[in-house]
UniProtKB/Swiss-Prot annotation:
Phosphotyrosine: modified positions: Y34
Location of the region described as Interaction with BCL2L1 isoform Bcl-x(L) and inhibition of BCL2L1 anti-apoptotic activity in the Swiss-Prot/TrEMBL record: 36-55
GO molecular function annotation: CD27 receptor binding; metal ion binding; tumor necrosis factor receptor binding; virus receptor activity
GO annotation terms (biological process): extrinsic apoptotic signaling pathway
Gene from which the chain derives: Siva1
Role, per record: Induces CD27-mediated apoptosis. Inhibits BCL2L1 isoform Bcl-x(L) anti-apoptotic activity. Inhibits activation of NF-kappa-B and promotes T-cell receptor-mediated apoptosis.
Name used for this protein in its record: Apoptosis regulatory protein Siva
Organism (species): Mus musculus (Mouse)
Subcellular location: Cytoplasm; Nucleus
Primary residence: cytoplasm
Cofactor remark: Isoform 1 binds 3 zinc ions. Isoform 2 binds 2 zinc ions.
Entry keyword set: Apoptosis, Cytoplasm, Metal-binding, Nucleus, Phosphoprotein, Zinc
Subunit structure as annotated in this protein's UniProt entry: Binds through its N-terminal region to the C-terminus of CD27 and to PXMP2/PMP22. Binds to the C-terminus of TNFRSF18/GITR. Isoform 1 binds to BCL2L1/BCLX isoform Bcl-x(L) but not to BAX.
Tissue expression: Highly expressed in testis, heart, liver, lung, and muscle, and less in kidney, spleen and brain.
Length: 175
């Protein structure tokens, strides 16, 4: 006599061994918990890195000036826009390093090369847009505001009345 077949073949699921790993758990049952743990760990690492960087900067004796104090020096009555590297202070305000806030922020001990022609420069002429050192032949004066500009930041305007150089700030308003 032949073997009798199972009457519940369609209703019973197959019983196979299934490997459930960390990937399956992190996308399935424990998805919210794992994503929260990853978020907290990432946030903790970011804050530790920022704290370590801030401690490293403060240990180098880089005194920090507030933005308003760095804007006071410059043309009489007209505040200069802040150029160069800015730092976010512990209170959330933008600050500048003392070396950058000083006149040009260039060291006086080593000779400096012009950023355009590589001649030796005394460090007095600095582009008002990108703060690169310039020699006397590579410096251009803006026709609109009188600021110093380099070859890269100055825009030559060849109009009917001759050539005039505009800085990038004034070139926006002329166009």
């Amino acid at each position: 006599m032949p073997k009798r077949s199972c009457p519940f073949a369609d209703a019973a699921p197959l019983q196979l061994k299934v490997h459930v790993g960390l990937k399956e758990l992190s996308h399935g049952v424990f998805a919210e918990r794992y994503s929260r743990e990853v978020f907290e760990r990432t946030k903790q690492l970011l804050f530790q890195g920022a704290r370590a960087y801030r401690d490293h900067i403060s240990s180098e004796d880089c005194s920090v000036n507030h933005l308003q104090e760095s804007l006071k020096s410059g043309v009489v009555g007209a505040p200069q826009p802040a150029r160069g590297q800015m730092l976010i202070g512990p209170d959330g305000r933008l600050t500048r390093c003392q070396a950058q806030a000083s006149e040009g922020g260039l060291p006086r001990t080593a000779p400096i090369a012009c950023s355009s022609c590589m001649r030796s420069v005394d460090g007095k002429a600095v582009c008002s847009q990108c703060e690169r050192a310039l020699c006397g032949q590579c410096v251009y004066t803006c026709w609109g505001c009188g600021a110093l500009a380099c070859v890269l930041c100055g825009l030559a305007d060849y109009a009917d009345d001759g050539e005039k150089t505009l800085c990038t700030s004034c070139a926006m308003f002329e166009a």
